[in-house]
C-alpha cells in the first residue's frame, strides 16, 4: 500500500513538471507573438477594453475625451478579473506603474504561505481550492487556456499571471509571470503572499498583491546566551571559597589517618584475655590464649576510638 501511494505521488509530480514545461513553452510562444507589431486581443477582455487598447496602440492621434469615455466604460462594465489597466503592463508579468500611486481602500481576500515547490523550478503558485473557487471562478470556456489576471503591488506596479486549472493534480495554479514575481521580490519558502481587491463598488474589479517575509526564529541576536555560574575548585568540605560556612571544617586527611592508625595499634597491642576450654572454636587445652578480645576490652576499644575522633574533630 505504501509503495502504491509513493508511486502515485511521484507520478503526480512528474505530471506537474510536464505541465509546467508546457506552460513555459506556451509563454515563450506568446512572448514571440506579442513582440510582433500587430496587437492581439485577449479573449476575456471586454469590447470597451479592446477598443481602448486598439486606440492607444494606433499611430493616429485620438482626442482625450474619447479616451476618457472608453476608460470610463471599461471600469463600469469590467469583470472581477482585471485584464488591462492601460498603464503599459507587460504581458509576461511586469510593467512600470504610474508615478502617482492612488490610495484605494482594499478588501482582504486570502493569504498564501508559499512552499518550496511554489518558489521552485515548477514556476507556479498553487491557490487553495476554497479561495480559488470563491474569488477566481473558472467556466468551461476559460478552463482550457485559463485567464490572465492583473494585480497591483504596493508600489503600483502591475503584474499579470495566467490562472488555470490542472487536471493532473486537480489544483488551481498561477503560472505565467509568477517566476518573475518570485525573482524580483526574492520570495523564499515560508513567506506570505496576500491577495486583495477594491472594497468600493467602483474599484471592485481591481486586484492587489502584497507579500511579507517570514519571521526568522533562528536569529542569533534574538536570544542572548546567559553566563554560566562559576564553580568552586574546592569541594563542599574542602574549606575553600565555595565551602559552606555553616558546616564544620574537616581536618586534614593525614591527621585522621594517623589517629586511626594509632588507635588500631593500641587496640591490637593490648594483652588478650584468657578463655576457658568451653570455646567451640578454640582447641582444647589449659592456658590457651584467645585471639578475640573480651567484652571489656571491646568496650575499651570503642571508648578509645570515640575519644580519638572527638579530639581530631576539635583540632583546628
Swiss-Prot record:
Keyword check for Transcription: yes
Ranges annotated as biased composition (Acidic residues): 13-36
Pfam families: B3
An example Gene Ontology molecular-function term: DNA binding
Chain intervals with Gly residues compositional bias: 88-98
Subcellular localization(s) per the UniProt record: Nucleus
Record flagged with keyword Transcription regulation: yes
Residue ranges flagged as DNA-binding region: 110-215
Bias type Low complexity, positions: 46-77, 253-270
Keywords per UniProt: DNA-binding, Nucleus, Transcription, Transcription regulation
InterPro entries: B3_DNA-bd, DNA-bd_pseudobarrel_sf, LEC2-like
SUPFAM superfamilies, per the entry: DNA-binding pseudobarrel domain
One cellular component term from this protein's GO annotations in UniProt: nucleus
Region (Disordered): 1-100, 239-290
Name this protein carries in UniProt: B3 domain-containing protein Os04g0581400
Native source species: Oryza sativa subsp. japonica (Rice)
Amino acid at each position: 500500500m505504501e509503495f502504491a501511494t509513493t508511486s502515485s505521488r511521484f507520478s503526480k509530480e512528474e505530471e506537474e513538471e510536464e505541465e509546467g514545461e508546457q506552460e513555459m513553452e506556451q509563454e515563450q510562444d506568446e512572448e514571440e507573438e506579442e513582440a510582433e507589431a500587430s496587437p492581439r486581443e485577449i479573449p476575456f477582455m471586454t469590447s470597451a477594453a479592446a477598443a481602448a487598447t486598439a486606440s492607444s496602440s494606433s499611430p493616429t492621434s485620438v482626442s482625450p475625451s474619447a479616451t476618457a469615455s472608453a476608460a470610463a466604460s471599461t471600469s463600469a462594465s469590467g469583470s472581477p478579473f482585471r485584464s488591462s489597466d492601460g498603464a503599459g503592463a507587460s504581458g509576461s508579468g511586469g510593467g512600470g506603474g504610474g508615478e502617482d500611486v492612488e490610495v484605494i481602500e482594499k478588501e482582504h481576500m486570502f493569504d498564501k504561505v508559499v512552499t518550496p515547490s511554489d518558489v521552485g523550478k515548477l514556476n507556479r503558485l498553487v491557490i487553495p481550492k476554497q479561495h480559488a473557487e470563491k474569488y477566481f471562478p473558472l467556466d468551461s470556456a476559460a478552463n482550457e487556456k485559463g485567464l490572465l489576471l492583473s494585480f497591483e503591488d504596493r508600489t503600483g506596479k502591475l503584474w499579470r499571471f495566467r490562472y488555470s486549472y490542472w487536471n493532473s493534480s486537480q489544483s488551481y495554479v498561477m503560472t505565467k509571470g509568477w517566476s518573475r514575481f518570485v525573482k524580483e521580490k526574492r520570495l523564499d519558502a515560508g513567506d506570505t503572499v496576500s491577495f486583495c481587491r477594491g472594497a468600493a463598488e467602483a474599484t471592485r474589479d481591481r486586484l492587489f498583491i502584497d507579500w511579507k517575509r517570514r519571521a526568522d526564529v533562528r536569529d542569533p541576536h534574538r536570544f542572548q546566551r546567559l553566563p554560566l555560574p562559576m564553580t568552586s575548585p574546592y569541594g563542599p568540605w574542602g574549606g575553600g571559597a565555595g565551602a559552606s560556612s555553616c558546616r564544620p571544617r574537616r581536618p586534614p586527611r593525614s591527621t585522621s589517618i594517623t589517629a586511626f592508625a594509632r588507635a588500631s595499634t593500641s587496640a591490637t597491642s593490648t594483652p588478650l584475655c584468657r578463655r576457658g576450654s568451653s570455646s567451640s572454636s578454640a582447641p582444647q587445652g589449659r592456658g590457651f590464649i584467645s585471639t578475640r578480645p573480651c567484652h571489656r576490652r571491646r568496650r575499651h576499644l570503642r571508648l578509645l576510638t570515640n575519644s580519638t575522633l572527638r579530639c581530631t574533630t576539635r583540632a583546628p
